Regions:
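Phosphate/diphosphate ligand-binding glycine-rich loop within oxidoreductases
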Residues: 40-111
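Rossmann-like adenosine-cofactor binding region
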Residues: 49-50, 149-233
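Glycine-rich adenosine-cofactor-binding loop
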Residues: 96, 115-136
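Oxidoreductase and adenylate-handling cofactor-binding alpha/beta cores
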Residues: 96-110, 137-140, 238, 257-266
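Rossmann-like dinucleotide-binding domain for NAD(H)/NADP(H)
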Residues: 195, 201-331
Length: 331
């Protein structure tokens, strides 16, 4: 069996080698020629998985060490009997702590308290539900928008138009598909409250970046249209700008790698179903107060410094992302 693995995936080297011929490659080097005789791929978002990559190959299993799969042509894989696995929820607490750092930055800059804001959470899955839970605990008034969940469950969800009209801050945690591409459009932006802030740690295409740039709204982006080639005007106008690393925590990366290994083990019947990286501490999740958050998060994560670095080194987006020092989760 031959397995090709993205060389930027952490903690994975040496794990599959006892059971397969393993080749490590940069995401951009994983091409049709490279995968022709591979049985399995373990990739990241930098590898687009479609007919161009997979045609006339032996690939029958693809795992992505990411929560989303919009870089994978799922219909093609289904038609050709290729198993696809992702890592939903793996980095939820890492993203939560990125959003927390962003909220702290905004609230302190405005000389306000959480009680002064209505926060709209769009996409209430693994990440969004955590953000909503903690934001309520911190004192924000929270409104939730999740049409698929509303259709399945009913409940107290709001439309995206209601979110736009009532919220001071909107934070996005949706997948990218035909229903969410440019969900934040020029039309929706016109409905938003004056000076409202948009936070995007989901997928770049969920927001029409140029429409936001030409509005009077603040925005904090971890994900960008066209990345790694950022629009310099959009980057310069951001209140907070980071290189697609919101979920880059030690634990989040360990979880993603473990989920890929477990999926590979299940599909190929390998004795790795209980594997987890050695030496990784799994923190006990806990609610912390707004006061504790404001006092402690700067020593764990200086988001302003990180934002300044990206604005200074925009052309190094990919290097900043690939060489990122993973953060430790602490709540």
């Amino acid at each position: 069996m031959k397995v090709i693995i993205d060389s930027a995936i952490p903690y994975i080297r040496g794990i599959v080698e006892p059971y397969a011929d393993v080749a490590y490659m940069a995401g951009a080097e994983i091409t049709n020629d490279a995968v022709r005789y591979a049985d399995a791929l373990i990739i990241r978002t930098r590898t687009k998985v479609d007919a161009t990559l997979l045609e006339n190959s032996n690939v029958k299993f693809v795992a992505t060490a990411t929560i989303g799969s919009d870089h994978i042509d799922l219909e093609y894989c289904k038609r050709h009997g290729i198993k696809v696995c992702s890592a939903p929820g793996c980095n939820a607490r890492g993203v939560l702590q990125w959003v927390a750092a962003t909220l702290r930055h905004l609230v302190i800059k405005d000389c306000c308290t959480p009680q002064d804001y209505t926060l709209g959470v769009v996409g209430v899955g693994n990440v969004g539900s955590l953000v909503a839970q903690y934001a309520r605990h911190w004192g924000f008034r929270v409104m939730e928008c999740d049409p698929p969940r509303q259709e399945r469950e009913g409940g107290d969800f709001h439309t995206i138009e209601e979110i736009a009209k009532e919220c001071d801050i909107i934070t996005l945690h949706t997948p990218l598909d035909t229903t969410t591409r440019h969900l934040i459009s020029s039309t929706l932006i016109e409905m938003m409250r004056p000076k409202a802030t948009i936070i995007n740690a989901s997928r770049g295409g969920v927001v029409d970046n140029r429409a936001v740039l030409h509005s009077d709204h603040r925005y904090a982006f971890d994900v960008w249209e066209g990345e790694p080639d950022l629009d310099p005007d959009v980057l310069a106008g951001a209140e907070i700008a980071t290189p697609h690393i919101a979920g880059y925590s030690v634990q989040g990366k360990a979880n993603a790698t473990a989920m890929c290994i477990h999926a590979l083990a299940k599909f190929f019947n390998l004795p790795l179903m209980k594997w987890y990286p050695d030496g990784i501490t799994r923190p006990t999740p806990r609610l912390i107060s707004w006061q504790e958050l404001c006092q402690t998060i700067p020593s764990h994560y200086d988001i302003s410094a990180e934002s300044n670095e990206l604005k200074t080194l925009a052309s190094e987006f990919e290097a900043l992302r690939n060489n990122y020092a993973y953060r430790e989760e602490y709540f």
